[in-house]
């Protein structure tokens, strides 16, 4: 690995830095979805819909007070808020729920920009490194007149492009995967909002 870092030139180091950032962001997201949100399965989603349709706000607040996933947090907070503010208007309650949902979405999207930068910058830095390497190689050709110097220089210069793509492609795959996970959670949050407002209207 260190050999390729040396022969690839100075642009290998910022790409390596982006690789470390990308790995850290991916591990953080995997921990979020598979450890912190591990209880957010199909059964939980069905149960929360069932409880919103059949249970009181008091009972709902009790059921979901110890859960840490976004759906449970919104349902619990919205239920408890209604119990202490029963005279609130529908528009105020709807605004409250939307604010809670936006807060949960912002937490889910935290650090997404890191993967975005790695996806965009890594291949660009790799291409820049290759171009700089080729300029040096052709400069060596004009000075020495030996074509073998150019071939060797271009071979080394291409390491940066390859390394940049090796960083960007996995980052892109994970980025798309995480976006799909977020979209699924957001769809469920929208359903929760509808059910909460429906329940609220039923109590008016």
Please give the residue ranges for each predicted region:
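Alpha-helical transmembrane segments of integral membrane proteins
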Residues: 12-25, 116-123, 167-171
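Pore-lining and gate-forming transmembrane alpha-helices of multi-pass membrane transport proteins
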Residues: 148, 152-175, 179
